[in-house]
Amino acid sequence: MTNKFYTSGEQRAAKVGELFASIASRYDLINDIQSFGLHRIWKRRLLRLARVQPGERALDLCCGTGDLALALAKNGADVKGLDFSEAMLRVAREKSKAQNPTSKIEFVCGDAQRIPFPDATFDVLTIGYGLRNLADLDAGLKDMWRVTKPGGRLLALEFGKPDNAVWRGIYFGYLKFLLPIFGRIFCGNAAAYGYILESLKHYPAQQEVAAMMRKLGWQNVRVVNLMGGIMSIHCAEKPSMNPAR
């Protein structure tokens, strides 16, 4: 299915790449405005759930401008950040250098469906607002499994679909009518933020994503809904002893 914001498969990946390149320089500003600053609270919640220990190896997928990667490093992790938008990565590198000139975070341009790291490399994987943008969600979750160490954790912050029909209608109305206005005013690109609702319409609800994770072998899968389900954090663990697959 296609429309002015949403296309499937590789066309979708190219479209998303263009959108993020066009807003990279003002991405942090518009995030603060469109979420009323709440995205910072949601990311801190994810980090608490991640239980990162000093010395652990962490991969922040779809890292964007680097908020989660920088926070993981502050918690003592050895961090890699992966994103397919070089424009977003440039902002992430600048932020990292400004916050900590000696930072050892490595930001890599690459595809979250074909992660350029060996099997069983990372103790912790995080992904903020990235699952919804994958051209093939199942392929992405499989590759996340591959690079996670046995006993490792996956945590994904993503837009959700509230169960309550009234709240869902209010939320979708905000995404449809107000968010593109913010995008046009503050970064000159309404389409980039109109895309959020269109991509969410094609993205599975929280429990469907959780079921996909379980089917692939992730254990202790749970969904933490935030603000009545407008946002969610998926938490999952790779078994300590890798079962036959």
Segments the model singles out, each with a brief description of its role:
Residues 57-114:
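Class I SAM-dependent methyltransferase SAM/SAH-binding core
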Residues 138-153:
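A short glycine-rich, Lys/Arg-flanked "PGG" loop and its adjoining helix->strand segment in the class I
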